[in-house]
UniProtKB/Swiss-Prot annotation:
<dbReference type="InterPro" id="IPR023404">
    <property type="entry name" value="rSAM_horseshoe"/>
</dbReference>
<feature type="binding site">
    <location>
        <position position="160"/>
    </location>
    <ligand>
        <name>[4Fe-4S] cluster 2</name>
    </ligand>
</feature>
<comment type="similarity">
    <text>Belongs to the methylthiotransferase family. RimO subfamily.</text>
</comment>
<keyword id="KW-0004">4Fe-4S</keyword>
<dbReference type="GO" id="GO:0035599">
    <property type="term" value="F:aspartic acid methylthiotransferase activity"/>
</dbReference>
<dbReference type="InterPro" id="IPR013848">
    <property type="entry name" value="Methylthiotransferase_N"/>
</dbReference>
<dbReference type="GO" id="GO:0006400">
    <property type="term" value="P:tRNA modification"/>
</dbReference>
<dbReference type="Pfam" id="PF18693">
    <property type="entry name" value="TRAM_2"/>
</dbReference>
<dbReference type="InterPro" id="IPR005839">
    <property type="entry name" value="Methylthiotransferase"/>
</dbReference>
<keyword id="KW-0479">Metal-binding</keyword>
<dbReference type="Pfam" id="PF00919">
    <property type="entry name" value="UPF0004"/>
</dbReference>
<comment type="function">
    <text>Catalyzes the methylthiolation of an aspartic acid residue of ribosomal protein uS12.</text>
</comment>
<feature type="binding site">
    <location>
        <position position="82"/>
    </location>
    <ligand>
        <name>[4Fe-4S] cluster 1</name>
    </ligand>
</feature>
<feature type="binding site">
    <location>
        <position position="163"/>
    </location>
    <ligand>
        <name>[4Fe-4S] cluster 2</name>
    </ligand>
</feature>
<dbReference type="InterPro" id="IPR002792">
    <property type="entry name" value="TRAM_dom"/>
</dbReference>
<dbReference type="Pfam" id="PF04055">
    <property type="entry name" value="Radical_SAM"/>
</dbReference>
<keyword id="KW-0963">Cytoplasm</keyword>
Length: 445
C-alpha cells in the first residue's frame, strides 16, 4: 500500500482506546497517520455501542466522516468497534456509505481490507464473535508519553441485567502474565511512568487460567519493571477483592492507593434486579475494610440512577449511602435501556425527567462531599505527575487522581519542571474537585 493518509477517530472507553492504538501500529508501516480526518484518504471510526448516548455519538460521527467523501479527501470509510459488533447487519443497511466494517475481533483484516478496496472497490464486512481471542500486540500510544493503559483481560462473565458487554466482547479471558509484563517493559522503555490496569473486571484476573484470582501477583511483578513509578487499578468489583490484593496495595509503594469500585447501586432490591452478585452489606464492609487496612486510600465509584422499578425509597437509600460513606470520587449515570438485555424488558421503566432529577440530586450531594474532602488536603504534600499548562499554571495529578475522570492539582510555573516529571507539590488551596499548590522541595524524578 502506498503511503496513503489515514486518520482514526476513537470513541468510547479506554479499552476501545487500546484497540485503536493496536490498529494505528498495524497501519503505521504502510500509511501516513494524520490527526485531522479532513486530510485523510482513509478514515477509521472505532465506535462505542454501550449506551444510547454513546450509540448516537458513534452514528453521528460515522455520518460526519462519510460526508468527507464529498467535501474532502476521503476515499475509504472504515467502521469498527462495539457498535458494529453489536448491530452488524442493521448498521450495514443504515449507513451504506461504509466501505469496510469490522467487528471487535477482526482487526487483523484491517490493512488487507483497505488494500482490496483501494484496488478493486470491493467492500468488506466482518463481524466474527470470539470467546477466545484477545487483541494484543504493539501499539502507538494516544495517551501522553508518561501514561499508558494496559488491558489485562477481555470480556465479562457477570451478565448484569442492564449491560450488553458480554454479548459484544464475549466471556472473561485473562491475558497471559508474560505477555502483560513484556508489554509493560516495552512501555517503560518508551518513557511511560504510570501504568493503568483495565478490564471489564480487573479483580477477576487469572481466574480462567489458574482457577483463582491472582491480580496481587501481577501487581507485584509489574512493580519490578524498571521505570514504572505508579500502577493504578480501575474497574475493581468490591465483592471480588481478596485479602492478598489488599495486602499488595497496602505494602507495594508503586501501587497507587486508589481503587475504582463500580458499585452502581446500594439497595439490595435494586442490586438483585440488576443481577449484581453482591449486597449492600458486602459493599459497605469492603469499603470500611479498605479504609481501615490501607492508610490514605482514595475510593471512586460509579452509580446508576433510574433503574427500572427504582422507588423513592430505594433512591433515598442510595442518597443516604452517598451521604454517610462519603466516597472520595463519584460519577453518576442515568439508566439506559439497552436492546438485548433483560432490564430493557422490565416493567416500571423510569421517566427521563425523574432520572435527570435523581442524577442531579446525587451530583449536588457529592459536590459538597468532595469540597469538604479537598479542604482536608490543604497543607499536605503529594507526588504529582506534571501533565501540562493552562493559563500560565502547570497542572498534574497525584495518586488520588485518575486521568480524565478526576480532578487536577494546579501550581505556578517552575523553570525546572517539565511535563512528565514527577515532583512534590504542597497543597495551599482547595476547590470542589481540584487542588492548588506550590512546588515543594527538589525535583523528584
Amino acid at each position: 500500500m502506498e503511503k496513503i493518509k489515514v486518520a482514526l477517530v476513537s470513541l468510547g472507553c479506554d479499552k476501545n482506546r487500546i484497540d485503536s492504538e493496536l490498529m494505528l501500529y498495524k497501519l503505521n508501516e504502510e500509511a501516513e497517520l494524520v490527526k485531522d480526518p479532513k486530510e485523510a484518504q482513509v478514515i477509521i471510526v472505532n465506535t462505542c455501542g454501550f449506551i444510547e448516548t454513546a450509540k448516537e455519538e458513534s452514528i453521528n460521527t460515522i455520518l460526519q466522516m462519510a460526508s468527507y467523501k464529498k467535501t474532502h479527501n476521503c476515499k475509504v470509510l472504515v467502521v469498527t468497534g462495539c457498535l458494529t459488533q453489536r448491530y452488524k447487519g442493521e448498521l450495514k443497511e443504515l449507513i451504506p456509505e461504509m466501505d469496510i466494517m469490522l467487528g471487535v475481533n477482526d482487526y487483523d483484516k484491517l490493512l488487507e481490507s483497505i488494500k482490496v478496496f483501494l484496488k478493486s472497490g470491493e467492500k468488506s464486512f466482518y463481524h466474527k464473535y470470539s470467546d477466545t481471542k484477545i487483541n494484543e500486540g504493539n501499539r502507538i500510544l494516544t495517551t501522553p508519553t508518561y501514561t499508558a493503559y494496559v488491558r489485562i483481560a477481555e470480556g465479562c462473565n457477570n451478565f448484569c441485567t442492564y449491560c450488553a458487554i458480554p454479548r459484544i466482547r464475549g466471556k472473561y479471558r485473562s491475558r497471559k502474565k508474560e505477555n502483560i509484563l513484556k508489554e509493560v517493559e516495552n512501555l517503560a522503555k518508551q518513557g511511560v511512568k504510570e501504568i493503568i490496569l483495565i478490564a471489564q473486571d480487573t479483580t477477576m484476573y487469572g481466574i480462567d487460567i489458574h482457577g483463582k484470582k491472582v491480580l496481587h501477583e501481577l501487581l507485584r511483578d509489574i512493580s519490578k519493571v524498571e521505570g514504572v513509578k505508579w500502577i493504578r487499578l480501575l474497574y475493581c468489583y468490591p465483592e471480588e477483592i481478596t485479602e492478598e490484593l489488599i495486602e499488595e496495595i497496602k505494602n507495594n509503594d508503586k501501587v497507587c492507593k486508589y481503587l475504582d469500585l463500580p458499585i452502581q447501586q446500594i439497595s439490595n432490591s435494586v442490586l438483585k434486579r440488576m443481577g449484581r452478585k453482591t449486597t449492600k452489606e458486602t459493599i459497605i464492609n469492603i469499603i470500611k475494610k479498605l479504609r481501615k487496612e490501607i492508610e490514605g486510600i482514595t475510593l471512586r465509584t460509579s452509580l446508576i440512577v433510574g433503574f427500572p422499578g427504582e422507588t423513592e425509597g430505594e433512591f433515598s437509600e442510595l442518597k443516604e449511602f452517598v451521604s454517610d460513606i462519603k466516597l472520595d470520587k463519584l460519577g453518576v449515570f442515568k439508566y439506559s435501556k439497552e436492546e438485548g438485555t433483560s432490564a430493557a424488558l422490565m416493567e416500571e421503566q423510569i421517566d427521563e425527567e425523574i432520572k435527570e432529577k435523581r442524577e442531579e440530586e446525587i451530583m449536588i450531594l457529592q459536590q459538597s462531599i468532595s469540597k469538604d474532602i479537598n479542604k482536608e488536603k490543604i497543607g499536605k504534600i503529594y507526588e504529582v505527575i506534571v501533565e501540562g499548562i493552562k493559563e500560565d499554571m502547570y497542572y498534574g495529578r497525584n495518586y488520588e487522581m485518575s486521568p480524565e475522570i478526576d480532578g487536577e492539582i494546579y501550581f505556578e510555573k517552575d523553570e525546572n519542571v517539565k511535563i512528565g516529571d514527577i515532583i512534590k507539590v504542597k497543597v495551599t488551596h482547595s476547590l470542589e474537585y481540584d487542588l492548588i499548590g506550590v512546588v515543594y522541595n527538589e525535583l523528584s524524578k
